[in-house]
Regions:
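Glycine- and Gly-Pro-enriched alpha-helical subdomains that act as flexible
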Residues: 4-5, 9-34
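Short basic, glycine-rich beta-strand/loop surfaces that mediate nucleic-acid
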Residues: 6-7, 45-55, 68-114
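Generic structural signal for well-ordered, non-membrane alpha-helical segments
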Residues: 16, 20-24, 60, 99, ...
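Compact, glycine-rich, soluble single-domain proteins
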Residues: 24, 32-33, 37-58, 69
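Alpha/propeptide regions of enzymes that mature by internal proteolysis
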Residues: 59-64, 72
Length: 114
């Protein structure tokens, strides 16, 4: 089974719409980095996505380092700063798609964004 995880920072003030746009950026950009075999398998299974949260930029960077060690494709999203946050603010991280087993080793302890 395959999935994609998007992780959002909750320590910065973002409206629901802003969070939606940042998760969309993360999902699309990360999926473009996937190899064809993984992308095709993920699409065939219905493109499962899970949205999780962290409390800081540091927490996102720790996840990036774990992705690098496990060779999982990812996309770290920095906002342009035109609306709600300062330019260059890191808002979200798209992880995968990849196997659930691999991604769970990186994000398995994180809470859902509600």
């Amino acid at each position: 089974m395959y999935k994609q995880v998007i992780v959002v920072r909750t320590d910065i003030k973002m409206s629901k719409g802003k969070i939606a746009s940042q998760t969309a950026h993360a999902a699309v950009d990360a999926s473009h980095k996937a190899d064809k075999k993984t992308l095709d398998a993920w699409k065939k299974e219905g493109q499962k996505k899970v949205i999780l949260k962290v409390n800081s930029e540091t927490d996102l960077i720790v996840l990036v380092e774990k992705c690098q060690k496990m060779k999982i494709k990812y996309s770290l999203i920095s906002d342009a700063g035109r609306t709600e946050v300062e330019p260059g603010t890191i808002t979200a991280l798209g992880i995968g798609p990849d196997t659930e087993e691999k991604i769970n080793k990186v994000t398995g302890s994180l809470p859902l964004l509600k």
